[in-house]
Amino acid sequence: MIDQFERLPGIGPRTAQRLALHLLRQPEDQIRAFAEALLAARSQVGQCQTCFHLSAEPLCDICRDGTRCDQLLCVVADSRDLLALERTREYKGRYHVLGGLISPMDGIGPDMLQIPSLIQRVDRDGISEVILALTPSVEGDTTSLYLARLLKPFTQVSRIAYGLPVGSELEYADEVTLTRALEGRRAMQ
């Protein structure tokens, strides 16, 4: 059981051991309920037909929300990124989940992601702006450049700004982060 927990992202050996020991101390009915919840989630949760976010319904809550701005589309690599943006409660547009990033080193090409559906969606729905919210990595930059080139004939394309986290010290920031922070600077209001 410890080995299975260690396979989860962010779970190291000590945490895996703690989780396993905790479960072994639980009554059998609670363990059964936990196992059934895992199996039910796996069988009942799929992808939204429009944006490819996780959903138990054909359309996710965000795609069903009539108050969202239909002209603004934020592209993310996966549902974790979408959920992180939603936690800000600032973005009011729609999303498109790619299902990963272009990574030739890992054998992931554009055809393995939800890129064709993105192009169709932008063209079909008359999206006025696509916001690329992809990680500042080699794969994220590659995917962003690829998408920008494909989407510019159809719509305005922007990318979220990157910079220093709130409360951080300049002396500890790496050169790439500082460069992007300088490039993404804004006038004081």
UniProtKB/Swiss-Prot annotation:
Checking Pfam families in the record gives: RecR_C, RecR_HhH, RecR_ZnF, Toprim_4
Q: What residues does the Toprim domain cover?
A: 71-165
InterPro entries reported for this sequence: DNA_Rcmb_RecR (IPR000093), Rcmb_RecR (IPR023627), Rcmb_RecR_Znf (IPR015967), TOPRIM_dom (IPR006171), TOPRIM_RecR (IPR034137)
- Give this protein's Gene Ontology molecular function annotations: DNA binding; zinc ion binding
Q: Describe, by residue range, where the zinc fingers (C4-type) fall in the chain.
A: 48-63
Q: Which SUPFAM superfamilies match?
A: Recombination protein RecR
Lineage: superkingdom: Bacteria
Q: Which GO terms describe its biological process?
A: DNA recombination; DNA repair
Function statement: May play a role in DNA repair. It seems to be involved in an RecBC-independent recombinational process of DNA repair. It may act with RecF and RecO.
Q: Which family does it belong to?
A: Belongs to the RecR family.
**Any idea what this protein is called?**
Recombination protein RecR
- Upper taxonomic classification of the species? Bacteria, Bacillati, Cyanobacteriota, Cyanophyceae, Synechococcales
